[in-house]
């Protein structure tokens, strides 16, 4: 398996697990409120991030807000449009087919013999550039 294939496998598995997390917690939050499930949702989300993402403090984003929706932002149908490998960094551009049909750019880093997702960006057609987007 090539390094590019290994990195893509990490990205796809992350997307699948995030999709499952959203599918599980969105109805619970909507129907019963966040308070009852906040701790369990945070733990499961932290476990996903610990498994797939670079180890760094994320002061904003899903780990803080526990945001999820219907349809889920993450979908197994998200298509990889292009990929690029450069030494210890791999970049994937994907197309979302749910919600706003965004284009995303994921950057993965190779550290300690494994690929980890470091950041996510969304292409802004209005600004005609990639902008930071929370994982």
Curated annotation (Swiss-Prot):
Coiled coil: none annotated. This is Immunity protein RhsIA. Disruption phenotype: A double rhsA-rhsIA deletion is outcompeted by wild-type cells, restoration of rhsIA restores normal growth in competition experiments. Restoration of growth requires the RhsA-specific immunity protein, rhsIB does not restore growth. Residues 58-77 are annotated as: Disordered. Immunity component of a toxin-immunity protein module, which functions as a cellular contact-dependent growth inhibition (CDI) system. Specifically inhibits its cognate toxin RhsA. Cell contact is necessary for growth inhibition. InterPro entries: Imm-NTF2. It holds the Pfam family Imm-NTF2.
């Amino acid at each position: 398996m090539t390094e590019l294939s290994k990195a893509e496998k990490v990205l796809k598995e992350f997307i699948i697990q995030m999709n499952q997390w959203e599918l599980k917690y969105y109805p619970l939050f909507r129907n019963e409120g966040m308070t009852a499930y906040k701790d369990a949702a945070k733990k499961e989300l932290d476990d996903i991030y610990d498994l797939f993402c670079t180890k760094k403090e994320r002061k904003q984003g899903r780990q803080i807000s526990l945001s999820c929706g219907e349809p889920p932002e993450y979908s197994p149908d998200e298509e990889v449009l292009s990929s690029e490998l450069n030494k210890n960094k791999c970049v994937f551009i994907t197309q979302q087919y749910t919600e706003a049909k965004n284009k995303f750019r994921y950057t993965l880093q190779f550290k300690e013999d494994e690929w980890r997702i470091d950041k996510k960006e969304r292409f802004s057609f209005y600004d005609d550039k990639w902008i930071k987007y929370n994982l």
